[in-house]
């Protein structure tokens, strides 16, 4: 019985690994299809350097990567939206969007819809500007949560029980 479970677990692992390879291979094929369609291997495309990749490599700290990744995903979603009527490349675009959906949005349709909704808000509309400024006081604490947590941790270690040599002496006496 134990051997049967081990074999089933092994088969499950192999199936998962092979499906991941298949999906990755399909994604690469679809990207290659887009490159061929747009003739993006041509020398004139390389002139002026990379459009997105250099920016991505400049943002390598753990907290920074999510910020720039969301902007890059937004860029590609806008690009795909502009190309949505092109039937010749629609399958490739759909495959790439599905991969972004699975990896960036954790397959959550609600997160994807919220993301797309944010990218489509018309920032030149006066009513939108007024609403956004009105909400800013509520939004900012959520956006700067990491910064305030770092400050709180730093304060805790230096005052009232942090790593002082003699904890019996008050911080004000040091």
UniProtKB/Swiss-Prot annotation:
One of its GO terms (biological process) is adaptive immune response. InterPro entries: 4_helix_cytokine-like_core, Interferon_gamma. The modification Pyrrolidone carboxylic acid is found at residue 24. Glycans are attached at residues 39, 106. Keywords: Antiviral defense, Cytokine, Glycoprotein, Growth regulation, Pyrrolidone carboxylic acid, Secreted, Signal. One of its GO terms (molecular function) is cytokine activity. Homodimer. Interacts with IFNGR1 (via extracellular domain); this interaction promotes IFNGR1 dimerization. This is Interferon gamma. It comes from Mesocricetus auratus. The lineage of its organism: Eukaryota, Metazoa, Chordata, Craniata, Vertebrata. The gene is IFNG.
């Amino acid at each position: 019985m134990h051997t049967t479970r081990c074999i089933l677990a092994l088969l499950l692992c192999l199936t998962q690994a092979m499906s991941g390879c298949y999906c990755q291979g399909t994604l690469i094929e679809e990207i290659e299809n887009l490159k061929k369609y747009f003739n993006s291997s041509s020398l004139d495309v390389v002139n002026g350097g990379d459009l997105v990749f250099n920016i991505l490599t400049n943002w390598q700290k753990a907290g920074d990567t999510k910020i720039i990744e969301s902007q890059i995903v937004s860029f590609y979603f806008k690009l795909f939206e502009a190309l949505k009527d092109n039937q010749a490349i629609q399958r490739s675009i759909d495959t790439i969007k599905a991969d972004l959906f699975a990896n960036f949005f954790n397959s959550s349709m609600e997160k994807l819809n919220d993301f797309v909704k944010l990218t489509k808000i018309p920032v030149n509309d006066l009513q939108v500007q007024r609403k956004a400024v009105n909400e800013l006081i509520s939004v900012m604490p959520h956006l700067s949560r990491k910064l305030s947590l770092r400050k709180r941790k730093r304060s805790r270690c230096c005052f009232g029980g942090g790593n002082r040599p003699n904890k019996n002496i008050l911080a004000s006496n040091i």
